[in-house]
Every structure is written in C-alpha cells, then in structure tokens.
C-alpha cells in the first residue's frame, strides 16, 4: 500500500484465509465492514491439507459463502484453492502475490486438521513480510482501536500504515505506549552482557535519585512518542487519544484492551533493539496467544531495511 498522501486512493489487496470456522466468519465480516477503495481485490484462500480430500467439499462451501458475504459492486473478489500445509501455502502465496493485508482466524474449525489454528497464526505473523490481521470472535464491528507503540522505527511504520488503513468512519483510535517499570529495565540492561537472564541472587543496587531522574526522562520520552504517533495518524485524517501505561507492555496492553472493550489491537511485529527494548521482543507473540480482540501486526517492505 502506498504510504504517500494523494488525491487518488489506490486499490487495496486483501488475502483472506477461510476454513468455515467461526473465527474465519468473523474475519469475513470484518473485511465486509471496511470502506475499501474502488477496485480493491479480495482473494479468498482455502487450504486443503495433505490426506484430507474429504474436507475439500466443506471448504468449497465455506469459500462460496465468504464470496457471497463480500460481494459488492465496487470491490472484486476471487477464490483460490490451495493444497498442502497451511502455513507454507499461505506464506508462498503471499510472497508471490504481495497483499496489503492478509487476514486469518485465530483458531480453526477442525483441530485434527490443524488448519488455521493459533500455531498457524503465529507462524504466519513471524514469517510474513506484509501486514497480518488475526481475528477473534465475537465480532461486533470495529469501534475501538488501540495502536501500541514503543517508539521504534517499526512502530512508526505501523502508525503510517494505520493512518492510511480503511477503518470505518466511526472507529476511535487510542495510542498506547507501555513502558516497563524502570527498576526492571535497569536490572535487565545491567545483566545483558554475558548473562541474559536474572535470578533472585543477582540484585542490582540502583541509586534512588538517579532512578527518579530517569523516570522523569522516561515520562518525557513517552509523551513525545505519543505526540509523534498522533501526528502521523492525523496526517491520515485519523484523530487519536494517547495514554501511557506502566509495567510489562504485553500484560498492560492486554489488560487495557480487555477493560476498554477494544475491538482491534495494532502493533509493529518487532520493537527496539535487544538492549534498549528488551521488553518488546515477546509482545507480538503474547498478543497472538492471549488477546481477546483481533490483532493487526504490521510488517512492510520498508521494515526489512530497518536494522535490528
């Protein structure tokens, strides 16, 4: 998707993985609610795993139902049936036909088939070089959206993507910056050299005045991150509110989203460098597994050129 503002809004290319499960139905309904630009293309993908030919007829019915749900005059739809292991097929198809967005259900219909399960969602999120939206039920529309940011370049790319994303006009966006407790961050950084883990026998003496000063600097940085992120969103005509949370980012984002009834969490798939942003590394994985809402992980071609 072109990030440059212009009077022409380019068509949006979406790849939707369908298996007939309630999560895939929710994904279809979510896409239906997006105000997509004219001539956008929705490719509805079905994957028949090895040795499961009897599943094909059920899958074809699910694909036809999804196409019927998504049918509209201004948007093109096509159905593609793939054969093989789901993660491999989706990644290969996405690599060949670069989407602006790939959408998959968090869980699949038949656990024994291992189609579109949480494990698959994690594989696709980690391997894809394009944005991936993992949907969950129940789906009640996109009313409240959280953009999680840690101030990294990848978070900036996520904000730029969301600024141009075709959200429903009534959707409210909240920018959340979750910063770990300073003592925890300082302790981890102190031991990041040859030892990458902590035990109770590894205390770190932290000077309180220094901590107080660092805490104030951290707050200032957090406010600056929120201000810059909101500026990016407003460039795409999306108004947003900002909030700073203290504590483990994944836990704070999950708790805040559940408390506020958030419908969609948006995050970059990678964060800061290992030392400066150690707390962000596992956030995307935790969001895939534990979020009650749908989650959009933003990876772009530009991100591939961002240093770790």
State each model region's role.
Residues 2-58, 69-75, 144-209, 232-241:
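Small/aliphatic-rich secondary-structure junction motif
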Residues 1-9, 33, 49-52, 57, ...:
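Structural beta-alpha unit
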Residues 1-13, 22, 28, 87-139, ...:
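Gly/Ser-rich helix-loop-strand patches that form or flank binding pockets
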Residues 19, 82, 108, 137, ...:
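Structured loop/turn residues at secondary-structure junctions
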Residues 43-45, 78-82, 133, 176, ...:
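General small-molecule cofactor/ligand-binding pocket signal
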Residues 32, 64, 122, 160-163, ...:
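Active-site phosphate/pyrophosphate- and oxyanion-stabilizing loops and adjacent acidic/basic residues
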Residues 30, 36-39, 44, 58-62, ...:
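Aromatic/pi-system hotspot detector in well-structured domains
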């Amino acid at each position: 998707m072109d990030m440059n503002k212009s009077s022409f809004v380019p068509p949006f290319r979406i790849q939707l993985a369908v298996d007939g499960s309630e999560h895939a139905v929710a994904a279809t309904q979510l896409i239906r609610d997006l105000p997509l630009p004219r001539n956008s293309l929705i490719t509805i993908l079905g994957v028949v795993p090895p040795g499961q030919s009897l599943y094909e007829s059920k899958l074809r019915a699910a694909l036809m139902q999804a196409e019927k749900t998504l049918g509209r005059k201004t948007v093109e739809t096509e159905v593609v049936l793939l054969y093989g292991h789901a993660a491999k097929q989706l990644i290969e198809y996405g690599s060949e036909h670069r989407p602006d967005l790939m959408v998959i259900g968090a869980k699949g219909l038949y656990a024994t088939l291992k189609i579109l399960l949480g494990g698959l969602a994690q594989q696709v999120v980690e391997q894809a070089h394009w944005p991936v939206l993992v949907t969950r039920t129940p789906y009640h529309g996109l009313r409240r959206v959280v953009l999680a940011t840690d101030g990294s370049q990848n978070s900036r790319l996520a904000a730029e993507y969301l600024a141009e994303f075709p959200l429903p006009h009534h959707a409210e966006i909240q920018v959340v910056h979750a910063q770990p407790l300073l003592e925890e961050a300082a302790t981890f950084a102190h031991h990041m050299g040859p030892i990458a883990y902590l035990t109770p026998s590894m205390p770190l003496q932290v000077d309180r005045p220094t901590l107080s000063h660092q805490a104030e600097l951290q707050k200032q940085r957090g406010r600056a991150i929120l201000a810059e992120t909101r500026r990016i969103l407003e460039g795409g005509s999306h108004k947003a509110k900002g909030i700073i949370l203290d504590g483990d980012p994944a836990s704070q984002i999950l708790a805040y989203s559940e408390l506020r009834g958030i419908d969609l969490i948006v995050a970059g798939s990678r964060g800061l460098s290992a030392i400066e942003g150690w707390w962000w590394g596992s956030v995307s994985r935790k969001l895939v597994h534990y979020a009650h809402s749908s989650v959009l992980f933003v990876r772009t071609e530009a991100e591939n050129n961002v240093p770790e």
